[in-house]
UniProtKB/Swiss-Prot annotation:
Alphabetical UniProt keywords: Disulfide bond, Metalloenzyme inhibitor, Metalloprotease inhibitor, Protease inhibitor, Secreted
Protein name stated in the entry: Metalloproteinase inhibitor 4
GO molecular function, one term: protease binding
Disulphide bond pairs: C107-C154, C112-C117, C125-C146
Subcellular location: Secreted
Organism: Oryctolagus cuniculus
Region (Involved in metalloproteinase-binding): 6-9, 48-49
Top-level taxon in the UniProt lineage: Eukaryota
Family statement drawn from the similarity comment of this UniProt entry: Belongs to the protease inhibitor I35 (TIMP) family.
PROSITE patterns listed in its UniProt record: NTR
SUPFAM superfamilies: TIMP-like
InterPro entries attached to this UniProt entry: Netrin_domain (IPR001134), TIMP (IPR001820), TIMP-like_OB-fold (IPR008993), TIMP_C (IPR027465)
Keyword DNA damage: no
Amino acid sequence: ISSEKVVPASADPADTQRMIRYEIKQIKMFKGFEKIKDVQYIYTPFDSSLCGVKLEANSQKQYLLTGQVLSDGKVFIHLCNYIEPWEDLSLVQRESLNHHYHLNCVCQITTCYTVPCTISAPNECLWTDWLLERKLYGYQAQHYVCMKHADGTCSWYQGRLPLRKEFVDI
């Protein structure tokens, strides 16, 4: 994150909302290539009450940022996205980002907030960190990967164990 600047949320002078525009140096993109090639700026609401994200600008800190590409091509992030300093990611998360996650885009992760919760399709993995630990990015997020099997179903795989034969193309 090389700089931050407070900018109007829209060109409408009656709109009093503000955004923070972070200028970034993109190191690697893991998905979304079809929507945008290179990201120079990311936007977030100015107010934390609107789920705005505060990042450290002008530091050497590197982040994993997830967000949305809006119809106007701007990349938007907020508190509900997964945003983590790269150094805080587990080894499994870093290896999976570089080698496994892109193979499993057909898998859907369903967050379990309360019981009962179930999957509704064979390509879903049930994410239980919130239910068990009351945090979204707990042990399951740090140490497991939702992976596709040869038969098209998806299930959790513990990242540091050797891959079993039933997992596809790995």
